[in-house]
Amino acid sequence: MKPDDKKTILSYGAFLQDKGINFKLFAPNALTVHLVIFDKPEAESGTEYAMMKFDAGDWSYKLKNAGIGTMYGYRLSGPLNDSNVIVADPYSKASITQNSWRHIAKSLVINDEFDWQGDTWLNIPKSDLIIYEAHV
């Protein structure tokens, strides 16, 4: 059995499709993976759905009747994973955390469509860039 998407890193994460969301994660050493859906940002647990394993360690699940604003995480079990911990999607485009010492990182499904109105990438040479990094 193979997933519908192309096998590229860009196909991992959460994608809106046909009145639902397709979730895809790469976890080759996991024995089981559960998608956890949260009702509220402060929730510590949620509804769990067993994901299907495909070739080469890809895990997938189609959540029907869900969309933008869905909060989720993953629970993995296996030799390298603690099944008591819910983890955020490493491929997510947005996340939610609580400002506390013990929070459960949650990923958030967002609308990432934007009309760039024909704008193009600047392609500035790396030698002309000035990049600052700050930790707060």
Feature annotation, model-predicted:
Residues M1-D18, N22, K53-E133:
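The feature marks proteins involved in alpha-glucan
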Residues F26-V33, G67:
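Short proline/glycine-enriched turn/loop motifs at strand-loop junctions of beta-rich domains
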Residues S45-F54:
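Solvent-exposed serine/threonine-rich low-complexity stretches and specific carbohydrate-binding patches
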